[in-house]
């Protein structure tokens, strides 16, 4: 639920390495 400051419209979340995942075109961490 916390925004990771990254979008994932065209590319995946690079912040995935710190448990961030794509949701509604924005990367979130829980």
From Swiss-Prot:
There is a cross-link at residues 1-30 (Cyclopeptide (Gly-Asn)). Transmembrane segments: none annotated. Detected in stems (at protein level). The keyword Disulfide bond applies. Keywords: Disulfide bond, Knottin, Plant defense. The keyword Disulfide bond applies. This is Cyclotide hyen-E. It comes from Pigea enneasperma (Spade flower). The lineage of its organism: Eukaryota, Viridiplantae, Streptophyta, Embryophyta, Tracheophyta.
């Amino acid at each position: 639920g916390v925004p990771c400051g990254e979008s994932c419209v065209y590319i995946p979340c690079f912040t995935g390495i710190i448990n961030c995942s794509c949701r509604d075109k924005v990367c979130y961490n829980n």
